[in-house]
Amino acid sequence: LKGNTMIPDKLKDDFNSLRNMFDELKREIDKNVVREENYKGEFYEISPYSYQRNRFKQGKIVGNVTSLKTTNNLFTYYFDVKNQIIEIREGLELKNQFYYTFFIYEKELMKTIAYDNSKRIVNVRYYLYGSNGKIEKMYSKGSRGSREETYFYENDRLQKIVIRQFDRNDIEQDTLQHSFDYKSNGELKSIILSTELYSETIYQET
């Protein structure tokens, strides 16, 4: 039965209040940057298997950024004194155009705010941690709709993520599931995307 979104009101308020806050937010975040790292492609998992779930392999480190012919797919990670990622800059096909994601850490919560290359807000996300220190819920509010992800673990290992999707009027649309299979040594083997109608392998370790 499709229902209404369970997206927290606070998240909706944040999405609206942060809509035009790019410059101010970037100024505040940048004050806390102590180092940066550059990669071609995504390198760090923001949530469990975040880039694998989007069908990508892990990015490669870039030693000398000035030697690159293009900034397309260049990911720059900015860290604070606690070695936490507080900003990600993602290069686009257009020369020297970037998407930005900012990170704010609170008790049992990680908040991300994403903007496009025109400083328009893309989404705000809440990642909620459980007593095991692992992400249990992710709520996202974006310009095109919202989503709720629930993470299920067994023996401290992620087994599946159930993804509920809602349109911009908060009416529930599709429910997806990502299921995770592991090698005998505990490394990720594959990810299967399934709906009520079909399933497909979206990531396969070779």
Give the label of every model feature segment.
Residues 4-206:
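Buried hydrophobic residues that stabilize the cores of well-folded domains
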